[in-house]
């Protein structure tokens, strides 16, 4: 089917989201996604209402016969927040074509898209090709932490510089850097690490976070935040010359024990598909995939 016949044969429209329709919009968004950190409609609605007006204006409703059947967020050359009401997924390609037309009218040529893999077929039909994907994993917390022969202590804000350099070393040459993850100059890294302490990725949980020390040297770290209703592994790293000795497992299990002591029943993390050593570690501690994969794809101009 050609793009022209697709666009002409399906009566869907794309309209800027009106605040009065925000509840219906986010209800539709949640209903069409399985890869979300939470299905709590109120959390998503509150996050939207807290955005500055220019960011609220990046949200568009997919409508049919005046009813919201889908959601999408548009950046200058980016599609995200895409979701369709489960009974209307056959309209996905037509909705995406409308979104692409808006972006191209604004001067976009190449377009990057972020979506759940249940929508990969309509994106692929319009020329998008997968670059990478990440998945959410969750595990029940438990108190039986593995023994560890290094000093553990909660990280403090004045350790931002040391943690920055540690994480930069951990991720140097990592497979994720090919996808633009964990890259950038030291100043950006420092801002990122400082932001974790300040709550940019959810409320920082110092009592569940640890750095592992050998003397004054950081050889491992786990940073936990409380993000969208559940504790999250914001960062986990082990020095390259200390890998394969159980330190990553010990850090995870220590954090899980602390969380269990706080009556937090589950812990979540995100991992890039293809990072097989990390996935194997997580599965060995009872982490399992929750929902679909979150895909990043690209349409070249």
Task: List each model region and its residues.
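Conserved acetyl-CoA-binding loop-helix of GNAT-fold acetyltransferases
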Residues: 89-102, 238, 244-261, 280-284
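Acyl-donor-binding surface of acyltransferase catalytic domains
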Residues: 1-8, 76, 86-151, 155-156, ...
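A short beta-loop-alpha structural element at the N-terminal edge
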Residues: 9-27, 151-177
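Conserved beta-strand-loop-alpha-helix junction that forms the acyl-donor binding cleft
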Residues: 111-120, 240, 269-279, 296-301
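A conserved beta-turn-beta hairpin within the catalytic core of GNAT-like acetyltransferases
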Residues: 68-83, 131-133, 204, 226-234, ...
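Helix-loop element at the rim of GNAT/NAT acetyltransferase active sites that forms part
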Residues: 27-42, 166-182, 200-201
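A conserved beta-strand-loop-helix scaffold within acyl/acetyltransferase catalytic domains
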Residues: 47-48, 74-77, 178-230, 236
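Conserved donor-binding loop and adjoining core beta-sheet/short helix segment
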Residues: 32-103, 214, 222-231
């Amino acid at each position: 089917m050609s793009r022209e016949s697709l666009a002409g044969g399906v009566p869907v429209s794309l309209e800027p989201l009106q605040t009065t329709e925000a509840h219906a919009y986010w209800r539709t968004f949640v209903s069409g996604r399985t890869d979300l950190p939470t299905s709590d409609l109120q959390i998503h609605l509150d996050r939207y209402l807290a955005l500055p007006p220019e960011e609220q204006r990046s949200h568009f409703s997919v409508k049919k016969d005046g009813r919201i059947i889908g959601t999408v967020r548009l950046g200058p050359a980016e599609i995200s927040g895409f979701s369709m009401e489960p009974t209307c997924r056959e309209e996905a390609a037509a909705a995406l074509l409308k979104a692409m037309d808006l972006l191209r009218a604004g001067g976009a040529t190449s377009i990057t898209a972020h979506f759940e893999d249940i929508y990969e077929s309509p994106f692929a039909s319009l020329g998008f090709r997968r670059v990478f994907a990440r998945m959410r994993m969750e595990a029940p917390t438990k108190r039986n932490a593995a023994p560890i022969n290094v000093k553990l202590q909660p990280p403090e804000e004045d350790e931002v510089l040391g943690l920055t350099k540690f994480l930069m070393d951990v991720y140097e040459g990592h497979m994720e850097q090919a996808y633009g993850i964990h890259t950038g100059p030291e100043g950006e890294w420092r801002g990122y690490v400082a932001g974790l302490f300040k709550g940019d990725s959810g409320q920082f949980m110092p009592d569940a976070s640890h750095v592992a020390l050998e003397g004054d040297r950081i050889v491992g770290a786990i940073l936990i935040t409380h993000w969208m209703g559940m504790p999250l592994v914001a960062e986990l790293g082990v020095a390259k010359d200390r890998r394969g000795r159980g330190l990553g497992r010990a850090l995870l299990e220590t954090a899980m024990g602390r969380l269990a002591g706080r009556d937090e029943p589950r812990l979540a993390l995100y991992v890039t598909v293809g990072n097989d050593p990390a996935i194997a570690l997580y599965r060995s501690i009872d982490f399992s995939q929750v929902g679909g994969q979150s895909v990043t794809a690209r349409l070249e101009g």
